[in-house]
């Protein structure tokens, strides 16, 4: 009888603890963002509140005092929150590195403001890429598969 009662009490207390901790608390200070492309620097040590990243391991929200980490970026939206404003950039991939001094460095081959894309153009490019995936030429099929992955992520971001 005691074991059954103790097991019920333990299970309830464990569930309560897990339910309380679901997201990070805002940290003191600001995150310093460096966002660089080969031809342009979008942010250079700019203090921001939070950055949301499309990482290979899943969506990640980075705040000041985040644990140091290196993440591979997948095609998706990088959202930069500065106070009450938000800027969204579509990246085709890249890397993000969080340093112990609350500096986030994002490097990507290309990044464009999300509002610069036309949903109609994305749909037509997506249809073309889907046709090319079944190409007999292996190189063309591989390139089309990569293009398809990027365009599907872009189409999802525009919805």
Swiss-Prot record:
Its main location: mitochondrion. It is found in: Mitochondrion; Mitochondrion inner membrane. Pfam families: ATP-synt_DE_N, ATPD_C_fung. Disulfide bonds: none annotated. CDD domains: F1-ATPase_delta. One of its GO terms (cellular component) is proton-transporting ATP synthase complex. One of its GO terms (molecular function) is proton-transporting ATP synthase activity, rotational mechanism. Keywords: ATP synthesis, CF(1), Hydrogen ion transport, Ion transport, Membrane, Mitochondrion, Mitochondrion inner membrane, Transit peptide, Transport. InterPro entries: ATP_synth_F1_dsu/esu (IPR001469), ATP_synth_F1_dsu/esu_N (IPR020546), ATPD_C_fung (IPR048938), ATPsynth_dsu/esu_N (IPR036771). The keyword Repressor does not apply. Residues 1-23 form a transit peptide. Belongs to the ATPase epsilon chain family. Mitochondrial membrane ATP synthase (F(1)F(0) ATP synthase or Complex V) produces ATP from ADP in the presence of a proton gradient across the membrane which is generated by electron transport complexes of the respiratory chain. F-type ATPases consist of two structural domains, F(1) - containing the extramembraneous catalytic core, and F(0) - containing the membrane proton channel, linked together by a central stalk and a peripheral stalk. During catalysis, ATP turnover in the catalytic domain of F(1) is coupled via a rotary mechanism of the central stalk subunits to proton translocation. F-type ATPases have 2 components, CF(1) - the catalytic core - and CF(0) - the membrane proton channel. CF(1) has five subunits: alpha(3), beta(3), gamma(1), delta(1), epsilon(1). CF(0) has three main subunits: a, b and c. This is ATP synthase subunit delta, mitochondrial. It comes from Kluyveromyces lactis (strain ATCC 8585 / CBS 2359 / DSM 70799 / NBRC 1267 / NRRL Y-1140 / WM37). The lineage of its organism: Eukaryota, Fungi, Dikarya, Ascomycota, Saccharomycotina.
């Amino acid at each position: 009888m005691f074991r059954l009662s103790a097991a019920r009490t333990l299970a309830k207390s464990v569930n309560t603890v897990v339910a309380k901790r679901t997201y990070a608390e805002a940290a003191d200070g600001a995150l310093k963002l460096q966002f660089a492309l080969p031809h342009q620097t979008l942010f250079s040590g700019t203090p921001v509140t939070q950055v949301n990243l499309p990482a290979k391991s899943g969506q990640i929200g980075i705040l000041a005092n985040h644990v140091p980490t290196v993440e591979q970026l997948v095609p998706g939206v990088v959202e930069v929150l500065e106070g009450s404003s938000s800027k969204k950039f579509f990246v085709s991939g890249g890397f993000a590195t969080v340093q112990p001094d609350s500096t986030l460095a994002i490097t990507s081959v290309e990044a464009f403001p999300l509002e610069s894309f036309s949903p109609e153009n994305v749909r037509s490019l997506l249809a073309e890429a889907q046709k090319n995936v079944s190409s007999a030429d292996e190189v063309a099929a591989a390139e089309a598969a990569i293009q398809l992955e990027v365009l599907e992520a872009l189409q999802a971001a525009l919805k």
